């Protein structure tokens, strides 16, 4: 008898960080330093919260299917070009792009180690997934990547990369775009924490730039992803997407958040300050990062063991053993609130 469930969904899926509630209960903490999911530790600004609250009385009605207010805000404050959205974060954008472009058996290339959703979503679409390893310093080896990506239907590259923090230079992206037959999805979820700007490359018709409201804008709980796309993709994407890609609260909050430069710049400065402190004070090899997190090699310890040891001190970090091609001696730590960062530094020095 043929199995009732597809094989892609039997073995494994997305790996979540350990629950803060579980750590608190297990080790007796009233507060846990939540540094495992690359979140913004601070709530949105009051004006963002007020915008969301104002929509509560209208939730009996469906939201705007075109998310016009949010799109207008993005074009005003970020980039005046075609944009698409998803109410399921960057994950939803990735899944919809794949649904729009990729047919069963098509080749999808992924620069690894990286965010697992590219591969999971591509396999769910019955694509032929090819992982291309980065160099020892986690930079992209252009020739190695292009050897596979040149004839791929769709390729994924994350910059700054999750979980390594590596920033790929603009000229390297241009080099890739000039030499591929298909489309490059550039995941820029963390780009605001770097000093790099890929938006001028959007004149290319084979580039998608994905971004999110979850990180610098502090709206992870609302699950808002968006992408700047070539004109030819905008209409097909919207046909392939699920109806109502944003709810009323998320559109209202996001529309105000993108205009709140003071909030954004304040958090970026906070991240950059603590990122430098982490680089200086962590007593293990760390890697340069253009993001709101740091990758740490805790060898000879294993990543799982180090994460568990830190949990005993009330600190939640991400063990990176689930990232293919990375090895089992790495952990990733996000920049949190001051007290969280201080607790982490005290704990990591005891490993």
UniProtKB/Swiss-Prot annotation:
Highest taxon of source: Archaea
> For this protein, what is any one GO molecular function term?
histidinol-phosphate transaminase activity
List, alphabetically, the SUPFAM superfamilies matched: PLP-dependent transferases (SSF53383)
Q: Quote any Pfam family the record assigns.
A: Aminotran_1_2
Q: Which cysteines are joined by disulfide bonds?
A: none
Tell me what reaction this enzyme catalyses: L-histidinol phosphate + 2-oxoglutarate = 3-(imidazol-4-yl)-2-oxopropyl phosphate + L-glutamate
Q: What class of enzyme is it?
A: transferase
Which terms under GO biological process does the entry name? L-histidine biosynthetic process
Read off the InterPro entries from this record: Aminotransferase_I/II_large, HisP_aminotrans, PyrdxlP-dep_Trfase, PyrdxlP-dep_Trfase_major, PyrdxlP-dep_Trfase_small
Which keywords does this Swiss-Prot/TrEMBL entry list?
Amino-acid biosynthesis, Aminotransferase, Histidine biosynthesis, Pyridoxal phosphate, Transferase
N6-(pyridoxal phosphate)lysine: residues bearing it: 215
The pathway that the record names for this protein is:
Amino-acid biosynthesis; L-histidine biosynthesis; L-histidine from 5-phospho-alpha-D-ribose 1-diphosphate: step 7/9
Q: Which cofactors, if any, are listed as required? A: pyridoxal 5'-phosphate
Give the EC number(s) listed in the UniProt record: 2.6.1.9
Name the PANTHER family on file.
HISTIDINOL-PHOSPHATE AMINOTRANSFERASE (PTHR42885:SF2), HISTIDINOL-PHOSPHATE AMINOTRANSFERASE-RELATED (PTHR42885)
* Family note: Belongs to the class-II pyridoxal-phosphate-dependent aminotransferase family. Histidinol-phosphate aminotransferase subfamily.
Q: Under what name is this protein listed?
A: Histidinol-phosphate aminotransferase
Give the organism, scientific name.
Methanocorpusculum labreanum (strain ATCC 43576 / DSM 4855 / Z)
Q: Point out the gene that encodes the protein.
A: hisC
């Amino acid at each position: 008898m043929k199995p009732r469930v597809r094989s892609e969904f039997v073995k494994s899926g997305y790996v979540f960080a350990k629950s803060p509630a579980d750590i608190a209960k297990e080790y007796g903490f009233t507060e846990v330093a939540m540094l495992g999911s690359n979140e913004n530790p601070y709530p949105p600004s009051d004006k963002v919260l007020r915008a969301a609250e104002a929509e509560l009385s209208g939730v009996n009605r469906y939201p705007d299917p075109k998310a016009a207010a949010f799109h207008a805000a993005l074009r005003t404050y970020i980039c005046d070009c075609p944009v698409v959205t998803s109410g399921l974060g960057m994950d939803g954008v990735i899944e919809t792009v794949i649904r729009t472009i990729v047919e069963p058996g098509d080749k999808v290339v992924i620069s690894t180690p990286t965010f697992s959703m590219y591969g999971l979503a591509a396999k769910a679409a019955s694509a032929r997934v090819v992982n291309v390893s980065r160099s020892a310093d986690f930079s992209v080896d252009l020739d190695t990547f292009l050897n596979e990506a040149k004839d791929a239907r769709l390729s994924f590259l994350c910059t700054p990369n999750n979980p390594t923090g590596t920033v790929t230079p603009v000229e390297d992206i241009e080099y890739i775009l000039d030499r591929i037959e298909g489309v490059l999805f550039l995941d820029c979820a963390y780009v605001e924490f770097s000093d790099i700007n890929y938006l001028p490359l959007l004149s290319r018709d084979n580039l998608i730039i994905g971004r999110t409201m979850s990180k610098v804008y502090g709206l992870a709980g609302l699950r808002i992803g968006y992408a700047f796309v070539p004109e030819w993709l905008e209409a097909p994407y919207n046909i392939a997407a699920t109806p109502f890609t944003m709810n009323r609260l998320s559109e209202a909050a996001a529309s105000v958040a993108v205009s709140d430069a003071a909030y954004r710049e304040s958090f970026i400065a906070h991240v950059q300050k603590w990122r430098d402190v982490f680089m200086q004070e962590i007593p293990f090899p760390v890697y340069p990062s253009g993001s709101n997190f740091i990758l740490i090699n805790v060898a000879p310890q294993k990543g799982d063991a180090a994460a568990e040891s830190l949990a005993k001190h009330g600190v939640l970090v991400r063990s990176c053993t689930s990232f293919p091609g990375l090895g089992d001696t790495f952990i990733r730590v996000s920049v949190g609130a001051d007290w969280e960062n201080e607790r982490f530094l005290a704990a990591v020095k005891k490993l």
